[in-house]
Regions:
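C-terminal catalytic "cap/lid" subdomain
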Residues: 1-101, 105-271
Length: 271
């Protein structure tokens, strides 16, 4: 049994596109509804919940009946614009069925790096949380492009969720993906791969495991999650990585059930 994290009050939940979109491109409405139920329930328990959600391009492709992801950046941004609107419509419908208000916040890296706009974002988030509203955050894909000396992209929402956790002084980041946690090797290729129950330090060896030959996590996958975990560990906070196929797993994670991977720094008493 892991440490009980049910006392954590301010929680950032990040959900990836793979948990929102089926492999055939259909939107996972049942999964989104379950996520809304869980987060609304936690909010009703007095917790402060922030959702970082991917999925704009995936939902946009579904809405526009596209079978393949666009290659050109302007096309990707147009699809993201359609998808973000539709995604928020779905979220609003699902959360409203549980009497929970939500708000949309779209961010770019330069907003966070500029002190004045960073403070404005922080103020807005604090006010929404005070009002009992769940902020739903995504990168602003329609304008986020890195070119020359103007850097606006976070890289991916793994990094964004860790930055949001840092900005809001969250006590816990829960990252839901299409994997059960961090493994000692690629579980698709190695039947001996072992799931880490907890990780207390992001070492070069761990990063090598994430990017090693045969790993399915090379680009914006497990490496990105480990970098996000390092940011959380540096803050002496907690991060949980688990499979988002059934969002009710969040209840198990908070209760200390041995699912997923728990990233945290051990105290001197625990070492």
């Amino acid at each position: 049994m892991r440490a009980d994290l049910s006392n954590k009050n301010r929680i950032v939940v990040k959900i990836g596109t793979s948990s929102l979109i089926y492999p055939n491109g259909a939107i996972n409405l049942a999964g989104i509804d379950e996520l809304a139920f869980v987060l609304a329930a936690l909010q009703n328990q007095g917790k402060e919940i922030i959702l970082v959600s991917s999925g704009a391009i995936g939902v946009g492709m579904n809405k526009l009946n596209l079978k393949e992801r666009p290659v050109e950046i302007p096309q990707q941004q147009a699809v993201a614009a359609v998808g973000q609107s539709e995604l928020m419509t779905i979220y609003n419908q699902r959360f409203q069925s549980y009497s929970q208000q939500t708000a949309q916040i779209l961010l770019t890296r330069d907003i966070i790096e500029f002190p004045q706009s960073r403070q404005n974002v922080s103020n807005t988030l604090e006010q929404l949380l005070t009002m009992g509203i769940i902020p739903i955050i995504n990168e602003n894909d329609t304008v986020a492009v890195d070119e020359l000396d103007h850097l606006t992209k976070f890289g991916d929402n793994d990094q964004l969720s860790a930055i949001v956790a840092q900005l809001t002084k969250a006590e816990l980041l829960i990252m839901l993906s299409d994997i059960d946690g961090f493994y000692s090797a690629n579980p698709l290729n190695d039947p001996e791969a072992v799931l880490y129950s907890e990780i207390n330090e992001i070492t070069p060896e761990l990063l090598e495991q994430a990017t090693g030959k045969g790993s399915p996590y090379g680009t914006g996958g497990m490496t990105s999650k480990l970098k996000a975990a390092k940011r959380i560990l540096d803050l002496n906070s907690h991060m949980l990585l688990a499979n988002g196929k059934q969002p009710k797993i969040i209840f198990d994670l908070l209760a200390g059930e041995p699912v997923g991977t728990h990233f945290y720094q051990r105290t001197e008493d625990e070492q």
